[in-house]
Amino acid sequence: MKKRSETLGSDQSSSEIIEHVLEELNLKNIERRVKKYDQIESEYKTNIENEKKAFIKDVSQVQQKIKEFEIQKANQIKQLNEEKLSIEARKQQLEIEIRNQLLQYAEKLRIVVKTPMNQPTNTEV
């Protein structure tokens, strides 16, 4: 306190000195508050940046999973289409075989109907 009174001058009253000391204390208090505010703001910004990075990473992982899912589904669709074509080809093949067998049976039936009952047919063994 003595130093302050020396710096302020010996002609100042104690109330002026007290006022000056209070102003300095107030300034120090303000400086501490500003420093604390800056610290909180810095932590907040750091947390925001960390959350942003984590969010971007999560979004990237989700996008990757979506791409993998799309590729998987495209492969499944391709496989199903190939199976469908194979089944359709087999169906057509069976239709042709059935039609040929029916024609053979129809021809045999026609021969049986035209042949008298007591004559052997070339289909009998």
Swiss-Prot record:
Localization per Swiss-Prot or TrEMBL: Cytoplasm; Nucleus; Chromosome
Name where it mostly resides.
cytoplasm
The reported effect of Q119K is: Strongly decreases meiotic gene conversion at ade6, crossing-over between ade6 and arg1, and abolishes double-strand break (DSB) formation at a DSB hotspot
Entry's Gene Ontology cellular component terms = chromatin; cytosol; linear element; nucleus
**What GO MF annotations does this protein's record show?**
chromatin DNA binding
Null allele phenotype: Abnormal linear element formation. Strongly decreases DNA double-strand break formation during the meiotic cell cycle. Abnormal sporulation.
Question: Which N-terminal residues, if any, form the signal peptide?
Answer: none
Q: Which residues form a coiled coil?
A: 45-104
Q: Which UniProt keywords apply?
A: Chromosome, Chromosome partition, Coiled coil, Cytoplasm, Meiosis, Nucleus
Q: How does it assemble?
A: Component of linear elements (LinEs), which are similar to synaptonemal complexes, at least composed of rec27, rec25, rec10 and mug20.
**Biological role:** During meiotic DNA recombination, binds to and activates DNA double-strand break (DSB) hotspot sites.
Protein name as annotated: Linear element protein rec27
Q: Which gene specifies this protein's sequence? A: rec27
